[in-house]
C-alpha cells in the first residue's frame, strides 16, 4: 500500500508517524511539523505528521481535548501544504468522516474503538489509508477479525498498530510477539512506542507514563522488522497538554531516528530465521 507518494510494507524501510498528541495551537503545530519534516528529510525517512483535533477519550472531563474539528483541520491542511508532508489524525464516532478525509492522508482508529463494527466500516468507506490501533484488551490474533471488517468495505489500505496490552491496573506492557503475529493479517504493522509506555489513569485525573522506556521498546520493535513507528513528540513534554509523561522530547529525536534507521536496515537486509 501507499501513503501519499511512498510505499509501506513488503520489506520497505520503516516510516515515521510523529507529532504532538493533540493540536495545542497553530504555531506549535507549524513549528513541530517543520522541525520533524526537516529532520526526516535529512535522514531519508518517510514521515507522516500526527496530531489530533480532538482527544475524545481523556481521563477527566476537565482535560484539554484540542481545538475542535474545524480549526484542527484548518491547521492540518496548512501543515500539509507548507511542508509537503502527509498527515494523520484520530477520528471518533461523531467525527464528520468525509470532511476529515478531504484533508488528511491517513485516518486513525483509536484503540478503544477498534471493536465498533459500524464505526470501522464508515471510516474505511472513506477510501483512505487507515491505521487501526489494537485495543489494550485484545490478543494480537484478534486483529484479524478487525481487519476482515475493515477490508469488507473494499478498502485494502489497512494498517494495524500495537500500543501495549493491559497488565493489571494503570499499567501496559508490550509483547513483542504481537508484532510478528499481526503480520499474519497481511497488513503493514506499526508500533506505537509512546502509548505503549503509558500508565492509564496513573495520575488520578490523567494518565502517567514512562518515557524513559520509549528508546528500548522502539529498538526492540525494529528488531522485529516493523513497517512503521508511531511516536508522539513534544518540544517540552513536561508542559504538554496531553500525554506529556510518555511523549518523546522532540529535540532529541534526530540522533535516535538515525540509530533506528541503521537497525531497520540491518534487520531487513538479513534473511529471516525459520524454526
Curated annotation (Swiss-Prot):
Residue ranges of the TM segments: none
Query: Which EC number(s) does UniProt give?
Result: 2.5.1.55
Reaction catalysed? D-arabinose 5-phosphate + phosphoenolpyruvate + H2O = 3-deoxy-alpha-D-manno-2-octulosonate-8-phosphate + phosphate
Q: Which GO terms describe its molecular function?
A: 3-deoxy-8-phosphooctulonate synthase activity
Enumerate the subcellular locations listed in this protein's record, separating them with semicolons: Cytoplasm
A GO cellular component term found in this entry reads:
cytoplasm
Keyword annotations of the record = Cytoplasm, Lipopolysaccharide biosynthesis, Transferase
**A single BP term in Gene Ontology:** keto-3-deoxy-D-manno-octulosonic acid biosynthetic process
Q: List the pathway annotation.
A: Carbohydrate biosynthesis; 3-deoxy-D-manno-octulosonate biosynthesis; 3-deoxy-D-manno-octulosonate from D-ribulose 5-phosphate: step 2/3; Bacterial outer membrane biogenesis; lipopolysaccharide biosynthesis
Chief localisation class: cytoplasm
**What InterPro entries would the database entry show?**
Aldolase_TIM, DAHP1/KDSA, KDO8P_synthase
Entries under Pfam families matching the protein: DAHP_synth_1 (PF00793)
What protein family is recorded? Belongs to the KdsA family.
What HAMAP family would the database entry show? KDO8P_synth
Q: What NCBIfam families does the entry give? A: KDO8P_synth (TIGR01362), PRK05198.1 (NF003543)
What is the designated name of this protein? Answer: 2-dehydro-3-deoxyphosphooctonate aldolase
